[in-house]
A protein has these predicted regions:
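Acidic/polar loop patches that form or flank catalytic/metal-binding clefts of enzymes
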Residues: 166-167
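Long, repeat-rich segments with strong aromatic
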Residues: 170-173
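Charge-patterned, long linear interaction tracts outside catalytic cores
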Residues: 271-283
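Short alpha-helical basic/polar micro-motif
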Residues: 163
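HKD-type phospholipase D/PLD-like phosphodiesterase module
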Residues: 1-19, 24-160, 176, 180, ...
């Protein structure tokens, strides 16, 4: 199988039958995924769950993770709540027996998200280590640390030539990725950025958006908070925002991969076409 499209529903179903489950997320609210993990632990499966103890500016996520830890521990699961100062963890991944699953959002099932299944033993091994031990790593297929995941996205953009490039992110700041987008646009290559809508962009985000627009990048606000890039016949999919990876965030546990698989590239193209069409141009 190697890489293939999956879904949150598929992962929930797999958790219910797996004997060994390693699961990681930025936060885990009440819902079908939490219920599936609790049920698997109660049924005797080995379940190990890793969550960020203190999601950034997200008190609801902090409470959700504490409650999830309480319920999962009571059901017999192993739970790790990681403090961001020591182990920044933004990964959304699961390993069920011999298959790894990677999600670009937080297993919400409330809207579009991209879930990738991977049964390559090398990939499965490093994903399992990233989930269970918060160990950032990379192989030829997957990067599991933010700096390397975003570096691969930058390389995709830089290698696109005159082909149209579309990138979607929830948040954005000045970084090598925005520099690559600006350079393309200055040279006349069609370049679009879809960025999540918010009431209050940070000063750094406003500065990045102004610079991108000034150099000719088409900015669309809205989308679905996915993390995607499309450049010709190749695509990048991941969990990391286009905010750069300096300092502590360089080793943040994330994921990102570049693919030319026709089904995956087609899914990314469909998602980006949907989000470009449903968003508004930034004033």
């Amino acid at each position: 199988m190697a890489l293939s499209l999956s879904s949150v529903a598929d992962v929930i179903a797999r958790i219910s039958t797996a004997r060994d489950v390693a699961f990681g997320s930025y936060f885990l609210p009440e819902g079908p995924m939490r219920d599936a993990l609790v049920g698997a632990a109660r049924s005797g499966a080995h379940v190990a769950v890793t969550l960020q103890a203190d999601p950034y500016r997200n008190p609801h996520g902090r409470r959700d993770n504490r409650e999830a830890a309480r319920l999962l521990t009571a059901a017999g699961a192993e739970v790790s709540l990681l403090r961001s100062a020591r182990a920044p963890f933004h990964l959304k991944a699961a390993v069920c027996d011999g298959t790894a699953y990677l999600d670009d959002r937080n297993w919400t099932a409330r809207g579009p998200e991209m879930v990738i299944a991977d049964d390559d033993p090398s990939d499965v091994s490093i994903v399992r280590d990233a989930v269970r031990e918060a160990r950032p790593a990379a192989d030829a297929t997957i990067a599991l640390r933010k700096d390397e995941a975003l570096r691969r996205e930058v390389l995709l953009v830089e290698a696109a030539g005159d082909a149209p490039v579309v990138v979607e992110t929830e948040r954005v700041r000045d970084s090598p990725l925005t520099a690559a987008l600006r350079a393309r646009a200055r040279g006349g290559a069609p370049t679009t950025l879809v960025v999540g809508r918010t009431r209050h962009h940070s000063r750094a985000e406003r500065r990045a958006l102004v610079a991108l627009a000034r150099d000719g990048v088409v900015i669309r606000e809205g989308g679905t908070n996915q993390k995607l890039a499309l450049a010709g016949g190749a695509a990048w999919i991941g969990s990391g925002n286009a905010t750069g990876a300096g300092g502590r965030s360089a080793r943040q546990v994330e994921w990102g991969l570049v693919t030319r698989d026709a089904a995956l590239v087609g899914a990314v193209r469909t998602a980006l076409e949907r989000d470009v069409a449903s968003t508004r141009a930034r004033d």
